[in-house]
């Protein structure tokens, strides 16, 4: 393992975040800490994960898309952000693409994603 990958692995270990196994097509709920003045609260953002970047590394991020009041809204979350309180997988989607950017131009029934009923958790790297 090269030096940079080793440093990234150490940083990910130091964060010790419990990140569930999810991919593009899954419906996720992200609990994001929002600071308003002196108060901090957790705001849930629920939508379809349309992309993952840089895998599970320290620079990893994912994009979540939802329809809010008839308007499509996308938000990019850093995977190891300290502002992320929780990530919960609501529903597993069955898709054949890694990036679902085509959903941006679709509305209604054509934007639906079939549920993956045959999901198997992948084996951890340590096993």
From Swiss-Prot:
GO terms for molecular function: structural constituent of ribosome. It comes from the Bacteria. GO terms for biological process: translation. The keyword Ubl conjugation does not apply. GO terms for cellular component: cytosolic large ribosomal subunit. The keyword Ribosomal protein applies. PROSITE patterns: RIBOSOMAL_L19. SUPFAM superfamilies: Translation proteins SH3-like domain. Keywords: Ribonucleoprotein, Ribosomal protein. This protein is located at the 30S-50S ribosomal subunit interface and may play a role in the structure and function of the aminoacyl-tRNA binding site. Belongs to the bacterial ribosomal protein bL19 family. This is Large ribosomal subunit protein bL19. It comes from Jannaschia sp. (strain CCS1). The gene is rplS.
